[in-house]
Amino acid sequence: MPKVAVIMGSKNDWEYMREAVEILKQFGIDYEARVVSAHRTPEFMMQYAKEAEKRGIEVIIAGAGGAAHLPGMVASLTSLPVIGVPIPSKNLNGLDSLLSIVQMPYGVPVATVAIGGAKNAALLAIRILGIKYKELADKIKKFSEDMRNDVLSTRLEA
C-alpha cells in the first residue's frame, strides 16, 4: 500500500517530479504517482484528496506550475501533510509557481520546497514518515551522515 502520493498538474511536470519518485524508491517507500489537475479535473482532484488518507496515503507531494493551485487545493481537502513543489514555468522560471504555493492562507498549510525541488520534497516526506517509522528515521539519518562524510572527505587539488 502506498504511503506517499506524488501528484502533479500535468504530464509535463513528470520531468521534475520523477526525481521525487527516484528518492522514494531509493529508500524503499511505496508510492503512487499520477496526474491530478486542479483545473482540468477538479472533481477528481477533490475525490482524490478526500480519499487519500482512507487509502493509506500518509504524505502528499504535489507539483504544479503556473497558477499552481494543486498543492493548496489538495491541502484544503485533507488533513495529511502536503508538500508543494513549484515547477519551473516558461515565463517566470517558476517564480509564479513558488509564490502561488507558498502564500497559503491561515489554516491551509503547504510545506513548500525550492523551484523544481522534488528531491527535497521526497526527503522531507521521508522525514515526516520517520516520525512514525523508526526504520525510515534510521535511513534518513544515515543518508545525512553519508552526505556529511562525502563533504568532509572532499580534497581539492590546485
From Swiss-Prot:
Annotated metabolic or biological route of this protein: Purine metabolism; IMP biosynthesis via de novo pathway; 5-amino-1-(5-phospho-D-ribosyl)imidazole-4-carboxylate from 5-amino-1-(5-phospho-D-ribosyl)imidazole (N5-CAIR route): step 2/2
Database matches in SUPFAM superfamilies: N5-CAIR mutase (phosphoribosylaminoimidazole carboxylase, PurE) (SSF52255)
Catalytic activity: 5-carboxyamino-1-(5-phospho-D-ribosyl)imidazole + H(+) = 5-amino-1-(5-phospho-D-ribosyl)imidazole-4-carboxylate
Gene Ontology terms describing biological process: 'de novo' IMP biosynthetic process
EC number, UniProt record: 5.4.99.18
UniProt binding sites for substrate: S10, D13, R40
Keyword line: Isomerase, Purine biosynthesis
One GO MF term: 5-(carboxyamino)imidazole ribonucleotide mutase activity
InterPro entries per record: PurE_ClassI, PurE_dom, PurE_prokaryotes
A matching Pfam family: AIRC
Keyword Isomerase part of the UniProt annotation: yes
Signal peptide feature range: none
Protein family: Belongs to the AIR carboxylase family. Class I subfamily.
Function: Catalyzes the conversion of N5-carboxyaminoimidazole ribonucleotide (N5-CAIR) to 4-carboxy-5-aminoimidazole ribonucleotide (CAIR).
Protein name in the entry: N5-carboxyaminoimidazole ribonucleotide mutase
Native species: Saccharolobus solfataricus (strain ATCC 35092 / DSM 1617 / JCM 11322 / P2) (Sulfolobus solfataricus)
